[in-house]
Regions:
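Conserved helicase RecA-like core
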Residues: 1-223
């Protein structure tokens, strides 16, 4: 894509005004911006993602990889969620986990980049219309999609970056509602990223208690 941008850029007038927009602005993007702009002014619009973190109750679980499934079942049995999104880091794990949940009486849908767009739209509509309450997703749905009734996000696999974490958990508690997030920490790399999130965003996170106070997140919708 960068080559296409450069090709277009070279055909534009030398004397011009250039504006570039990005949802996030990591150092790698800043480097690219400098190639197309001279002494640019950086404008940061309200960082909704970070502000939203403060409205979420965030929990973590230290465990081994082999313990994840049992802990997930325990959480789904005990948490009174409206809808939940469970994030994993690969398409294979996305399909496998969704299948396992469905076979164990937790009807689930799996959404990832390998699905045809028509199928993704169909599954998206099922979830948005509250016909499905559990979604297993890859980073594809880590940002840019909002569901009114999602009040729980579970990081079955820790995100690969602090920025991705912020966007993932931001799927919970949208539109002024409450929400909780639960992150599985299975190794040192998981802990490193989680600690970075806590430090950079000045948020509080607690070990997952035996029972979560239902008053800290939205109750079930009544239809």
């Amino acid at each position: 894509m960068r080559a296409d941008v450069q090709k277009i850029f070279k055909k534009t007038p030398i004397d011009k005004q250039v504006m570039m927009f990005s949802a996030t602005l990591p150092e790698a993007i800043k480097t690219v911006c400098k190639k197309f702009m001279r002494n640019p002014t950086e404008v940061i619009v309200k960082e909704e993602g970070k502000e939203h973190l403060e409205k979420l109750q965030q929990f973590y679980v230290n465990l081994e990889e082999k313990e994840k499934n049992a802990k997930l079942f325990e959480i789904l049995d005990s948490v009174q969620f409206n809808q939940v999104i469970i994030f994993v880091n690969s398409i294979v794990r996305c399909e496998a986990l969704s299948d396992m949940l469905t076979k164990n009486n937790f009807p689930s849908i799996a959404i990832h980049a390998d699905l045809p767009q028509e199928e993704r739209i169909k599954l998206f509509d099922l979830f948005k219309e509250f016909k499905k309450r559990i979604m297993v997703a890859t980073e594809l749905y880590g940002r840019g999609v909002d569901f009114l009734k999602v009040n729980t996000v579970i990081n079955y696999d820790m995100s690969t970056s602090a920025d991705a974490y912020v966007h993932r958990v931001g799927r919970a508690g949208r539109f002024g509602s409450k929400g909780i997030t639960i992150t599985f920490i299975a190794n040192e790399e998981d802990k490193k990223i989680f600690d970075e999130v806590i430090k950079d965003n000045n948020i509080k996170a607690a070990a997952l208690p035996q029972e979560i106070d239902k008053n800290i997140y939205s109750m079930l919708f009544i239809f």
